[in-house]
From Swiss-Prot:
PROSITE patterns: PROA. It comes from the Bacteria. It is found in: Cytoplasm. It is an enzyme of class 1 (oxidoreductase). This is Gamma-glutamyl phosphate reductase.
């Protein structure tokens, strides 16, 4: 297919999605929830087909020499699929984010202003692997009244085709037009999708640093996403050793390919001699490769030396860098210099240290005495997430339903005109909030 043909075809797909989304935006909460329930049921019915498609994807990816972290994201086992379907049902239980009155203000008798939440329109979601991400995104899009055009990586094509086939079958039994969900599978379509600013309202890329930056640099459509997942745990001088070990191990090994897994462990010098041998043993038992700065090597001489590049590397694997710092201030400075503004944690029993850490670490998530792996839309109670945003502007952190809506101003009058409120005898506004 030529570039011109791809553009023409995708233009038609985008128009269909937008038309379907405009109808979805007008549906009742009950109708949307029925559609979400039908999607969950259809996914359950197609479970074997989806899992077999994923096995085929994994076999093909292995033959092509896929990187280990990406392979872990690609794998969709029965447990992951079950959790994803449960997440769909959880989204159905969430409050409808559409039609919420944010402002209701009388400007004058009979002249009322409202600010009401409404869908964004059409979402373009581009992701490299993680087929279960498609399931999460589709459920959130339906609940928030948005159409969605999915572009999966070549390694996950079979899995995503099976998922979208099931979703469309489920939607065909409801009031939601199946055209509200579309799937693209080629690189050429990715480039054309990024040019569809007439039809697509938001692009959400999920993938590697280089991938997200490519998207950001090649579209005029607003982009929501993060380019790195360099997270830290700082072990303060007042840390409880057992808590520190448990959190450090969980934050690294529970799922090292996740963007909220830690890549660097910062340790206060006064606790390092006691803490480091214990945590090193616990991590070694989980096959984690350790790298340390010069001071760490004095305590753990058997580990590899860390270099400057390690502080800015997202390993997404069983590798962890360790640095000893002299103070909380130094730890915060390191995080703000090398971190990705994703999620960072402090382990301490000192309340003042927590307040300082929370106030000065410029990340979307700042945690105390708990694992960075909690930075997740499902664990936050959002039902699911479309992605993580590390931007300074909202939405920030795990983005659920509230990040997929915008608002419009509605004003109702009885023939009111602006001239009444201007000039020498201007009538004053009442500006009374309901």
């Amino acid at each position: 297919m030529t570039t011109l043909q791809v553009a023409s075809s995708l233009n038609d797909i985008a128009q269909q999605t937008r038309q379907a989304a405009s109808l979805l935006a007008m549906l009742s909460t009950e109708a949307k929830n029925q559609a979400i329930a039908a999607v969950a049921q259809a996914l359950e019915s197609a479970k074997e087909e989806i899992l077999q498609a994923n096995i085929a994807d994994c076999e093909a990816a292995t033959a092509e020499g896929i990187a280990k972290p990406l392979y872990k994201r690609l794998q969709l086992d029965e447990h992951k699929l079950r959790d994803a379907i449960a997440g769909v049902r959880d989204v159905g239980k969430l409050a409808d984010p559409i039609g919420q009155v944010q402002i209701q203000r009388e400007l004058d008798t009979g002249l009322v202003l409202k600010r009401i939440t409404c869908p964004l329109g059409v979402l373009g979601i581009i992701f490299e692997a993680r087929p279960e991400a498609a399931i999460q995104i589709i459920s959130l899009a339906i609940k928030s009244g948005n159409g969605v055009i999915l572009k999966c990586g070549k390694e996950a094509v079979r899995s995503c085709e099976a998922i979208v086939k099931a979703v469309k079958q489920g939607l065909s039994t409801t009031d939601v037009n199946p055209d509200v969900v579309q799937l693209l599978t080629t690189r050429e379509e990715t480039l054309e999708l990024l040019r569809l600013d007439k039809y697509v309202d938001l692009i959400i890329p999920r993938g590697s640093n280089s991938f997200v930056r490519f998207v950001q640099e090649n579209t005029r459509i607003p982009v929501l996403g993060h380019a790195d997942g360099i997270c830290h745990v700082y072990i303060d001088k007042s840390a409880d050793i057992e808590k520190a070990i448990a959190v450090s191990v969980d934050a690294k090994v529970q799922y090292p390919a996740a963007c909220n897994a830690i890549e660097t462990l910062l340790v206060h010098h006064s606790i390092a001699a006691e803490f480091l041998p214990k945590v090193a043993q616990a991590l070694a038992e989980r096959q984690v490769e350790l790298k340390g700065d010069e001071r760490t090597l004095q305590i753990l001489p058997e580990i590899a030396a860390a270099t400057a590049i390690d502080w800015e590397t997202e390993y997404s694997d069983f590798i962890l860098s360790i640095k000893i710092v002299d103070s909380l201030t130094e730890a915060i400075a390191h995080i703000n210099q090398y971190g990705s503004r994703h999620t960072d944690a402090i382990i301490t029993e000192d309340v003042a240290a927590v307040e300082t850490f929370f106030g000065l670490v410029n990340s979307a998530g700042v945690f105390h005495n708990c694992s960075t792996r909690f930075a997740d839309g499902f664990r936050y109670g959002f039902g699911a997430e479309v992605g993580i945003s590390t931007q300074q502007m909202p939405p920030r952190g795990p983005v659920g339903l509230e990040g997929l809506v915008t608002y419009k101003y509605q004003m109702t009058g009885t023939g009111h005109i602006v001239a009444t409120y201007t000039g020498e005898n201007a009538k004053p506004f009442t500006h009374q909030d309901f």
